[in-house]
Amino acid sequence: MKIGVFSVLFYDKNFEDMLDYVAESGLDMIEVGTGGNPGDKFCKLDELLENEDKRQAFMKSITDRGLQISGFSCHNNPISPDPIEAKEADETLRKTIRLANLLDVPVVNTFSGIAGSDDTAKKPNWPVTPWPTAYSVIYDYQWNEKLIPYWQDLAEFAKEQDVKIAIELHAGFLVHTPYTMLKLREATNEYIGANLDPSHLWWQGIDPIAAIRILGQANAIHHFHAKDTYINQENVNMYGLTDMQPYGNVATRAWTFRTVGYGHSPYVWADIISQLIINGYDYVLSIEHEDPIMSVEEGFQKACQTLKSVNIYDKPADMWWA
């Protein structure tokens, strides 16, 4: 398994300095934002799509440092009820897929998207309860009239380009659980899979180990984000897991994103890595940092330290003992 990092952490650096820092930290891969929520500081889509020399220079800067691109990322909302947002998200995603094809980057990370309640809606609506029944009506509308038609078309485009799409299982979007991931995959094709981030599973009450087994057995894990979550049970008792307090209210929030090893022990992370490999995923652990009580530098380095201590780098030996 390789260890990488989402380069959005280092937008305070220029491209070359960022690459130097990642390489000096002993990592193997970088995940590069191309637009949407991650931004595009290090990767200007139109420039690279239009100019082969710039593409070659871009890749040379990366490979000269012994690094590879694990994936491009353009997390956004391609089925937004805001037509401008939806159009921009779709265009960015398709351009990113085209660039990935040109540069032999195997996967593009994004969100599934979330629609409004109906065709007249101006804002997204995320139904998470079947009753009152209006929510079930909204849910069916979003899946059958918005999500599936969009992704059926996009999945065929991804297949034509031979680029996998890794949808992050994230709250606020229709695909946020193993079930919804497999539901969309069944309605599209095998190019649609998961960008599995355990931090978004823990707070939903989903065991990441079980999710890895479910999705891995379906060959549906395309990318992995390494980020932790701390659950404060006393605060859960007050606010519930659907806590709407700002992320900065760490003392009172029910749960908080943490750097790897500060929500769950290294033993848990060792089990996660083992189960990923056992269930068919042996690609990259891409570090994210959204820890509210650590600097980016400290959080990143501690995540590196924890993951390096429990990672499985080599292929297994022949079972000479069996």
Identify the role of each PLM range.
Residues 5, 22, 30, 62, ...:
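Conserved, mostly hydrophobic/aromatic
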Residues 6-10, 33-37, 74-77, 113-115, ...:
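Active-site beta-loop-alpha junctions enriched in small/polar residues
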Residues 12-22, 87-97, 204-214, 269-272:
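Short, acidic/polar
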Residues 17, 61-64, 78-193, 270, ...:
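Active-site acidic/histidine proton-transfer and metal-coordination neighborhood
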Residues 19-24, 48-70, 97-104, 152-160, ...:
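Acidic (Asp/Glu)-rich catalytic clusters
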Residues 33-57, 112-119:
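Glycine-rich, proline-tolerant flexible connector loops at the mouths of alpha/beta enzymes
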Residues 296-316:
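C-terminal helical cap(s) of enzyme catalytic domains, especially alpha/beta-barrels
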